[in-house]
Structure formats: C-alpha cells, structure tokens
Amino acid sequence: MNSAIYPLGRLGVDDYLQGEQRAEVKHEYLDGQIFAMGGASRAHGLLALSLSALLLPHARRKGCQLFTADMKVRIDHDSGSWFYYPDLVLACDPTDREPMYVRRPCLLVEVLSPSTEHIDTREKLLAYRLLPSLREYLLLRQDSLQADLYQRAADGRWQHQRLTAPGDVLTLECLGADVTLSEIYVDLADLSVA
C-alpha cells in the first residue's frame, strides 16, 4: 500500500492512524496533511542501532521504553495534531501507553539525512519543544562526527551543546547515562572515530 490508501483532502487523526496500519510506507501527519517518508541509509541505520544498543540497558533499569523508528510521537497543539516518526523515542511515563504512538517522551533522537536535515533541525526542533515531558532532543550527523544535544533546563529554557570529538561525553539526563561519541559512531569506521 502507499499514499493512495488515504483519501484526498484533509485527513482526520483516526483515518491517518488506521491508514498507517495498512501502509507500506510510513507517513508523518501535520494537521490533516500527510507526508511520505523515505528509506534510510546504511550509516543512518547503524547510528540508530548503535545508540539504541547503548541506551537499552539504561532504559530497562529506569523502567522506560525505548522505541526505534516505527513509533510515532503525537503532538497536540491549539489548531490540531502532528505525528512524527523519530529515529529513537524514549518513553518513561508509565501512563503513556497508547498502542500506536507516544504522547509524553523524555528523549527524542533524529539521525540527520540530507533530505530531512532542515526539517529535523527547524520544524521538528520547534514542534518537539511543545511537548512538556520532553527533556532532551538529540541530533546525530551521519556524514561526520557530530551530535547536537538540546536539553530543557530546570527553568524551562533550552540549552544547546555540540559535541565533535571522539572522546566527547554525551550525558543524557533522562536515563542518567553517559556515552561517548566514539561509542555511538563505532560502526562508521570511514569517519575515523572507531
């Protein structure tokens, strides 16, 4: 199935969610409009898998759930709803158990690709900040050793940290976990970080 399973025009949330169960291609949803998502590169997949493997033991210890790529995040705002598919979603709220999406993530991760970088660094950055539960948003480049971490401070303001050296330590407060960039990028030897 593809986008043809969706009716033309504005789409309601229920129709979108039902369509996604049958769709062969994932779609993000922005106030009634759907946008098909493309496939990921090898580097993209390796980065997401590596970080997932590093974080999963911490998530289990904290009683959190870690999802990769196929879990939607729902953002409700004044004029409607948005659904995105982050590369990693960490949900630590035990009451956040919708079967098809997460409403209250603690951490969201996007691996940047050339076709989506402008969306991940602008649109999604602004949209994700609307989630009161979100404490951290991590962006990983797949073409160079670089991580951009946005963290919500106690006063509600967002702080940005860029890491670019193999030994730089990424501290994820949601999990109380520290990982180095070299651990995340271990499978990308062509970036000379392994």
Question: What are the residue ranges of the model-derived segments?
Answer:
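Gly/Pro/Ser/Thr-rich low-complexity, intrinsically disordered segments predominantly at protein N-termini
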Residues: 1-194
